[in-house]
């Protein structure tokens, strides 16, 4: 058991640390703080903890006579740390008669400690306070040092005081009930204090990390009985005693550091700001990522960034940065904001560079505008005794993954530098394998600290191959080898990132691993690129030798499963080694442990990179095993049985491949660089680079046995290398390429060509490096030629010819392909661009993407380039053009035969303006036009599936980001490889859309279709097998019912077009900004309600599907309901709601599996809104938020029981929870017990305006709250069987009540012009007003005088609400408008007058909307970019028609007219981007290649068509036959109902025709919505206008 410890601070032993010290706690307070009143303050969460209850009871029992104990409980969370809570507590203390001798006891985390401490500092001008911290963060940080504060709306901790507590009583036992994430969160501060002050404690923390995480991850929820209330509570419970000694020490040591620092600098003038290590950057992240990210998590990221800043300055060694990063990860903390789990936790919030810097400028350490950061010198020590000044330039570099390399202009020619690259990756990985297999202790020095070796060390540890520890402040790794005897299978897959070396070496090592009782295999896996890299030759050899290995994904690549109950037999092993020498080294190193001596024969041709094989053999010799090379058989080795004996020390040579970069820097800049620990005795082939490549190019080389010095010639005088075989140093070819790019000679016939061969293996490295170099060099203006096993680089004649990589939109980044060697090579060439320009000339830097990929072999490369070699670097926000946008991500459509894939694929391509490829047709093209059916007959289904998969992977690889729609065969999901490709595409942001329909109808259809290859089995069986696969592979889903009539078909097309536009983000989902409503459906099945759905939705911006009311929750049924609703309501936005029973609905409270499935259906169906209850489990909430795509989330909370008044903290906490989840809309529903509840609600609404808020009260007493709610008020309809909640009103009822309260002023609106006797406008508008309960009146004002309109209406009618303008006033009225919309300006006429207030008016034109919306409503897609348009006539309406067709995206618009002379002035008066072409002769129409699919007739309808105009029209109508949709003509005239143009278009050319009455109604509806702000009841209005 641990001892009670006392830690002095400011000269007093007031910090007490122990375990289970409640007796001591009570005794200390009562004995040393005598008082008449003790006040224990805590939050409601702590009240549930039995240890707290025990403490309170004991405190009461121990009170001396004359003393009393008060308890005050607040709501948990940061929101309680406010002025309001402070005032409430102070009022309570005053009411209770507390005086100056009061002792406040703050029991809780940082919120309680900060707030109660501040109350104590001000109450009665200061009373005593005792801090009893219960969270790890509070124990080691906030309770120590006397800082107290509350938050304000403008920021955290802005109001407070330094008020030292009388005691800080730290009882480790409180941590038993601390939630896992909070526990880990507190470790950030613990690690920080060790990092800045106590190296020994840091080392101790390192060695206990796995114990800590195992215990904390083992926390369980337990039910306990509350000793104070007898209620049953559920709390978290961690077995602290399992790591008591470790926990006690980490708390105590961290407190000691903070106490010592505070004692030296109480008011934070200098030394105390060292405690802010990690906080300058961490706080900036926290400001953006709060409240999703916790303080400690952001400080953890900040510590890594600030440590990298120190390394960038050349102060902190790379090893120390690696140690810090590793320990943070080991304790479960994030080290980058881009970690997948952390991004999901923070809801994928972005952390823009400019915002981070802005947040960093608000830091108490700063001096004015100068930023200060704590700089680490080594683990346990800071640089200086306070924070240091840093520039924004350096911070930008550290905070981003995109680097700007400026020209190497200011580097003196006589510069001489010594650079020591990190340890060799090749030697490091080999040394770790050999030492782990060896016996005894081996101290490995200069080990490369990189991603690769980190994965290798982790694997050796997980497989229990050796005991690993660190010395020399982490610079030396100590491997205690166990001779291979302890190697044991681990349950978790070994993740190796993109570490090719580690993956190859560990594959053979896996063959030596022993099974455990519970584990008979191990799995090796890696990132996406690692899962493409080859490993087959090695696996084939091991399999042939008795090791059982399975591929888990792609044949020939990771992930693999290696069975540990098979044996590594030994004997003769044949291995193909033409792809990678690592296969050879892998078997060589493990061969001594085979059952028999090994003869390893390399077959299939000359092995690649034989020098690396020689390296392995030499290293094996150092560890005690001698390999014999055959004298009779080429490329054959004999390896005896035996055990490695570890040397006591092994020093890793620096990486020769990495050394090529500083040496090439010297060559390119004409300076001198020495690498002091690589010479001609090196084990590594790349050590030849200076001698074999740079020397013949013109450099001076000095090489000893152990060092290499390169002095470059004058800048611009490097010579090309006619030919070099780089097979001994293949990794260095990339460096050679960038040197060759600026090499030239005087021979005019040479083309400055450098030829590099022997590097075929570089195509299967981290990327295809030969292709990568060719692609990226081209961006600099350097030409290359790819060779079968190499590359030719054609150098530029002058360095001045180097270009800044750019395209038509400006500079672009150099892609690094997540490959460290590509990044480092181009960092050199980037600095040469513009390096020879005049010194004062402003130069554009070159942008390098993904700079962090150099972490694989040289994490500190950029630091060396900057601090050692003198390069100027900066960081930058990713370019918009370089970030991956989903706007052009292709769409893959999957589904059963006869699901409508062919038709809907065409619609999809048309709606998005994408290209369409039918994969079955592509298959036939690639197989000599042989049909799929014939191919299957001749070759079988299996062969067809292989070909289908190949083609699919090919098109996705080549065109997945280029805006295509791929229609697939129904069986594409039958192949596991295709399924993986589909899922990979979906996870990369692509759209995989599952199209489905009623299976019964599909079966009937398929059985009658002879054109398709026959199914071998029953269709239903096929569906049952594939259904799960379709769902698994798709990220979107659309239910497409069979259509029996053309109107249904058009409705489905409109529905699909809006759906695809929504899920791809083309159509933005808007949250209404003004008064708006949604209707709540309560049907159990919508199938029989289709006729009523439109009128039910009148006046609403959205419709809510109460899924909990539906008859069943199956995926098909729910999808079908959504489809019915979309078709019936013309895709009014859907709110998808599953209301649980405890929130007032029908859905079972604990059916979380079904609930998840329903939310998945909603998101795949692209619903516009999803209602997410704030009482649901957090993991469900985060899952939905992270998968929401373009769907808006409504965070809802309902109080059906009326438990909470609107001034209760419950609503405040729920609102903050909604902010934490970053929902789009908050919906709160309370219960009005009395009328005053509505007033309290309005106060809440008025003080919570930072998110759209729906807030209403239920019951009839709450009706007024529904009237006063602004955004998306839930309403019912007279056509519904019942309302969804007590007190719901209809839209009309709300509007009438709001009018009676003065909320809506009655307006008078008019149609103006002459003649208007037959105008349908009054009927149109008054019908809408009546249905929606609006108080307005629409009448006629007949006149030919615009002046009279101004006098009588604009100026003379104080209730004027707007005017519909008709002939002859559309032009005359414009002079009286204060503003004109773009439409009115371009069309040149006003048909709508909108009052702006203060006697100001805006002129608009809705004729174009009437035309556009009438066309869309009749099946024309919203985007018709692949189709041309036609306008007939050149009068006033034709301008609106041209405007409408342009808005639809017509790439060309043809116009014909009886009088052709009128065309030219009309065309010239409109914008050139409309691309209008006037047709003067019939002959010119024959030459038009475009399909014409949409037309508008604007000629008088009461006269026959002119013969020539008719001839032109008919020639255009012929061109509609090939449009991507049913060609459609709109007649602008609405009398007569059928015109000559309509007749000829429909009867002779089968065009779909739209009568003018529809245009009339649509333009009127547009006016209605502009004047009233309400969505018009279209169907009712249309029926009223056209019923005559």
Swiss-Prot record:
The AROM polypeptide catalyzes 5 consecutive enzymatic reactions in prechorismate polyaromatic amino acid biosynthesis. InterPro entries: 3-dehydroquinate_DH_AS, Aldolase_TIM, Aminoacid_DH-like_N_sf, DHQ_synth_AroB, DHQS/DOIS_N, DHQS_C, DHquinase_I, Enolpyruvate_Tfrase_dom. The gene is ARO1. Pfam families: DHQ_synthase, DHQS_C, DHquinase_I, EPSP_synthase, SDH_C, Shikimate_DH, Shikimate_dh_N, SKI. Residues 890-1080 are annotated as: Shikimate kinase. Its main location: cytoplasm. Keywords: Amino-acid biosynthesis, Aromatic amino acid biosynthesis, ATP-binding, Cytoplasm, Kinase, Lyase, Metal-binding, Multifunctional enzyme, NADP, Nucleotide-binding, Oxidoreductase, Transferase, Zinc. This is Pentafunctional AROM polypeptide. NAD(+) binds at residues 43-45, 78-81, 109-111, 114, 134-135, 156, 174-177, 185. 7-phospho-2-dehydro-3-deoxy-D-arabino-heptonate binds at residues 125, 141, 147, 157, 189-192, 258, 272-276, 279, 295, 364. Its cofactor is Zn(2+). Homodimer. Residues 1306-1588 are annotated as: Shikimate dehydrogenase. Binds 2 Zn(2+) ions per subunit. The active site is at 268 (proton acceptor), 283 (proton acceptor), 853 (for epsp synthase activity), 1198 (proton acceptor), 1227 (schiff-base intermediate with substrate). GO terms for molecular function: 3-dehydroquinate dehydratase activity; 3-dehydroquinate synthase activity; 3-phosphoshikimate 1-carboxyvinyltransferase activity; ATP binding; metal ion binding; shikimate 3-dehydrogenase (NADP+) activity; shikimate kinase activity. It comes from Saccharomyces cerevisiae (strain YJM789) (Baker's yeast). Zn(2+) binds at residues 189, 279, 295. It catalyses: 7-phospho-2-dehydro-3-deoxy-D-arabino-heptonate = 3-dehydroquinate + phosphate; 3-dehydroquinate = 3-dehydroshikimate + H2O; shikimate + NADP(+) = 3-dehydroshikimate + NADPH + H(+); shikimate + ATP = 3-phosphoshikimate + ADP + H(+). ATP binds at residues 895-902. Residues 405-871 are annotated as: EPSP synthase. Its EC number is 4.2.3.4, 2.5.1.19, 2.7.1.71, 4.2.1.10. Residues 1-392 are annotated as: 3-dehydroquinate synthase.
């Amino acid at each position: 058991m641990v001892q009670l410890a006392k830690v002095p601070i400011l000269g007093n032993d007031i910090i007490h640390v122990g375990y289970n010290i409640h007796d001591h706690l009570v005794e200390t307070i009562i004995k040393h703080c005598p008082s008449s009143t003790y006040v224990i303050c805590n939050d409601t969460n702590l009240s549930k903890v039995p240890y707290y209850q025990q403490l309170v009871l004991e405190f009461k029992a121990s009170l001396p006579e004359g003393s009393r104990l008060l308890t005050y409980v607040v709501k948990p969370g940061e929101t309680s740390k406010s002025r309001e809570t402070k005032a409430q507590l102070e009022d309570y203390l005053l009411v209770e008669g507390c005086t100056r001798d009061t002792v406040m006891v703050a029991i809780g985390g940082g919120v309680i400690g900060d707030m109660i401490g501040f109350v104590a500092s001000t109450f009665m001008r200061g009373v005593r306070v005792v801090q009893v911290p219960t969270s790890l963060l509070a124990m080691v940080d906030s309770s120590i040092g006397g800082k107290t504060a509350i938050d304000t709306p403008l920021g955290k901790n802005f109001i407070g005081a330094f008020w030292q507590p009388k005691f800080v009583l730290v009882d480790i036992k409180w941590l038993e009930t601390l939630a896992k994430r909070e526990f880990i969160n507190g470790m950030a501060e613990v690690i920080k204090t060790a990092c800045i002050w106590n190296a020994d404690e840091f080392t101790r923390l390192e060695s206990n990390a796995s114990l800590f995480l195992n215990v904390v991850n083992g926390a369980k929820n337990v039910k306990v009985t509350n000793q104070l209330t007898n209620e049953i509570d559920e709390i978290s419970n961690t077995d602290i005693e399992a790591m008591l000694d470790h926990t006690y020490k980490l708390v105590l040591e961290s407190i000691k550091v903070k106490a010592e620092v505070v004692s030296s600098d109480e008011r934070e003038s200098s030394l105390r700001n060292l405690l802010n290590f990690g906080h300058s950057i961490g706080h900036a992240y926290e400001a953006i990522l709060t409240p999703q990210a916790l303080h400690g998590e952001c400080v953890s990221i900040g510590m890594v960034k600030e440590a990298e800043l120190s390394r960038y300055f050349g102060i902190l060694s790379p090893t120390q940065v690696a140690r810090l990063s590793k320990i943070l990860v080991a304790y479960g903390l994030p080290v980058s904001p881009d970690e997948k789990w952390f991004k999901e936790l923070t809801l994928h919030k972005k952390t823009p560079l400019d915002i981070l810097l802005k947040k960093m400028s608000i830091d108490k350490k700063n001096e004015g505008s100068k930023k200060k950061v704590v700089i680490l010198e080594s683990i346990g020590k800071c640089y200086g005794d306070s924070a240091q000044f840093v520039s924004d330039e350096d911070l930008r570099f550290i905070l981003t993954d995109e680097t700007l390399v400026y020209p190497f202009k200011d580097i003196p020619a006589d510069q001489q530098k010594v650079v020591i690259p990190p340890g060799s990756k090749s030697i490091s990985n080999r040394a770790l394998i050999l030492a782990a297999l060896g016996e005894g202790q081996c101290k490995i020095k200069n080990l490369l600290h990189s991603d690769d070796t980190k994965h290798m060390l982790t694997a050796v540890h997980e497989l229990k191959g050796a005991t690993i520890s660190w010395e020399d402040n982490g610079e030396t790794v100590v491997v205690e080898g166990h001779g291979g005897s302890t190697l044991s299978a681990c349950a978790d897959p070994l993740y190796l990132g993109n570490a090719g070396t580690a993956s190859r070496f560990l594959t053979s090592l896996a063959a030596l691993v022993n099974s455990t009782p519970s584990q008979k295999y191990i799995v090796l896996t890696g990132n996406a690129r690692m899962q493409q890299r080859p490993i087959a030759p090695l696996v084939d050899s091991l399999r042939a030798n008795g090791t059982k290995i399975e591929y888990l994904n792609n044949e020939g690549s990771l992930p693999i499963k290696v069975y540990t109950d098979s044996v590594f037999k030994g004997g003769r092993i044949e291995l193909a080694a033409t792809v990678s020498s690592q296969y050879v080294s892998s078997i060589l190193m493990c061969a001594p442990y085979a059952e028999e001596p090994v003869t390893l024969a390399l077959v299939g041709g000359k092995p690649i990179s034989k020098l690396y094989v020689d390296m392995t053999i030499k290293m094996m010799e150092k560890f005690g095993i001698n390999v014999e090379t055959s004298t009779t058989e080429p490329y054959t080795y004999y390896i005896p049985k035996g055990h490695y004996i570890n040397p006591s020390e092994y020093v890793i040579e620096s990486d020769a491949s990495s050394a090529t970069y500083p040496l090439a820097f010297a060559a390119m800049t004409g300076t001198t660089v020495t690498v002091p620990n690589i010479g001609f005795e090196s084990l590594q082939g790349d050590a030849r680079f200076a001698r074999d490549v740079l020397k013949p190019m013109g450099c001076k080389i000095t090489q000893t046995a152990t060092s290499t010095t390169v002095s470059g010639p004058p800048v611009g005088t490097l010579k090309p290398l006619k030919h070099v075989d780089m097979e001994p140093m293949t990794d260095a070819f990339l460096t050679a390429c960038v040197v060759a790019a600026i090499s030239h000679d005087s021979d005019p016939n040479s083309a400055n060509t450098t030829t590099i061969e022997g590097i075929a293996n570089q195509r299967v490295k981290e990327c295809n490096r030969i292709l990568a170099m060719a692609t990226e060099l081209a961006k600099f203006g350097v030409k290359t030629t790819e060779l079968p096993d190499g590359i030719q680089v054609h150098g530029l004649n002058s360095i001045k010819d180097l270009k800044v990589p750019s395209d038509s939109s400006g500079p672009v980044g150099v892609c690094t392909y997540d490959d460290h060697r590509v990044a480092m090579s181009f960092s050199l060439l980037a600095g040469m661009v513009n390096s020879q320009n005049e010194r004062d000339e402003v130069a554009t830097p070159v942008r390098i993407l993904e700079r962090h990929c150099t972490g694989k072999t040289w994490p500190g490369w950029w630091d060396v380039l900057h601090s050692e070699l003198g390069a100027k670097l900066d960081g930058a926000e990713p370019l918009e053009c370089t970030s991956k946008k989903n706007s052009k991500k292709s769409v893959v459509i999957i589904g059963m035969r006869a699901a409508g894939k062919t038709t809907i694929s065409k619609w999809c391509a048309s709606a998005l303006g994408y290209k369409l490829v039918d994969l079955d047709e592509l298959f036939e093209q690639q197989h000599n036009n042989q049909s799929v059916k014939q191919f299957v007959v001749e070759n079988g289904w299996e062969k067809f599936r292989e070909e289908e998969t190949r083609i699919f992977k090919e098109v996705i690889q080549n065109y997945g980001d280029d805006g295509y729609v791929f229609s697939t065969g129904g069986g594409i999901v039958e192949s596991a490889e295709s399924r993986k490709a589909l899922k990979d595409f979906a996870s990369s942001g692509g759209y995989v859309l599952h199209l489905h329909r009623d299976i019964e109808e599909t079966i009937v259809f398929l059985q009658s279709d002879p054109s398709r290859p026959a199914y071998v089995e029953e269709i239903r069986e096929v569906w049952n097998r594939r259904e799960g696969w379709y769902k698994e592979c798709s990220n979107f889903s659309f239910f497409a019912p069979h259509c029996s009539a053309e109107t249904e078909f058009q409705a489905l097309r409109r529905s699909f077009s809006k759906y695809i536009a929504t899920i791809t983000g083309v159509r933005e989902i808007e949250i209404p900004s003004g008064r708006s409503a949604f209707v709540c459906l309560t049907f159990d099945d919508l199938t029989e309600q289709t006729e009523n759905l439109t009128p039910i939705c009148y006046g609403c911006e959205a419709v809510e599907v109460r899924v909990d009311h539906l008859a069943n929750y199956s995926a098909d049924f729910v999808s079908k309901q959504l489809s019915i609703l979309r078709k019936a309501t013309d895709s009014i936005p859907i709110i998808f709601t599953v209301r649980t029973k405890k929130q007032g609905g029908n859905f079972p409270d604990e059916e979380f599996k079904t609930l998840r499935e329903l939310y998945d259906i909603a998101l795949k169906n692209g619903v516009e809104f999803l209602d997410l209850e704030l009482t649901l489990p957090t993991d469900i909430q985060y899952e939905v938020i992270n998968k929401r795509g373009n769907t808006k989330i409504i965070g809802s909370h309902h109080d059906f029981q009326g438990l909470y008044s609107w001034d209760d903290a419950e609503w405040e906490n729920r609102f903050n929870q909604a902010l934490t989840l970053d929902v789009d809309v908050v919906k709160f529903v309370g219960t009005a017990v009395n009328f005053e509840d509505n007033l309290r609600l309005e106060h809440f609404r008025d003080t919570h305006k930072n998110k759209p808020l729906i807030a209403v009260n239920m019951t009839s007493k709450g009706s007024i709250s529904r009237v006063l709610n602004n955004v998306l008020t839930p309403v019912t309809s007279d056509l519904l069987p019942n309302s969804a909640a007590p007190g719901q009103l209809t839209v009309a009822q709300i509007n009438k009540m709001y009018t009676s309260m003065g909320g809506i002023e009655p307006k008078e609106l008019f149609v103006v012009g002459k003649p208007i006797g037959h105008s349908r406008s009054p009927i149109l508008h008054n019908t809408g007003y009546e249905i929606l309960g609006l108080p307005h009146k629409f009448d006629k004002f007949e006149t030919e005088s615009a002046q009279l309109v101004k006098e009588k209406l604009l100026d003379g009618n104080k209730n004027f609400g707007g005017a519909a303008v008709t002939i002859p006033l559309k032009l005359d009225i414009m002079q009286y408008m204060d503003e004109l919309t773009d439409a009115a300006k371009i069309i040149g006429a006003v048909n709508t007058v909108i009052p702006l207030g203060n006697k100001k008016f805006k002129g608009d034109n809705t004729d174009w909307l009437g035309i556009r919306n009438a066309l869309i409503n009749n099946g024309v897609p919203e985007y018709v970019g692949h189709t041309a348009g036609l306008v007939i006539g050149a009068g006033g309406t034709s301008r609106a028609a041209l405007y409408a067709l342009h808005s639809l995206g017509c790439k060309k618009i043809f116009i014909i007219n009886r009088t052709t002379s009128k065309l030219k002035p009309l065309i010239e008066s409109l914008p050139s981007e409309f691309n209008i072409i006037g047709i003067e002769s019939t002959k010119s129409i024959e030459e038009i290649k475009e399909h014409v699919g949409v037309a508008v007739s604007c000629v008088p309808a009461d006269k026959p068509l002119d013969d020539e105009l008719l001839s032109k029209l008919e020639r255009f109508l012929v061109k509609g036959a090939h449009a991507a949709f049913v060609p459609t003509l709109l007649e602008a005239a609405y009398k007569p109902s059928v015109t000559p143009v309509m007749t000829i278009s429909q009867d002779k050319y089968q065009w779909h025709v739209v009568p003018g009455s529809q245009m009339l109604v649509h333009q009127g509806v547009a006016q209605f919505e502009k004047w009233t702000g309400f969505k018009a009841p279209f169907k009712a209005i249309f029926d009223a206008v056209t019923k005559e």
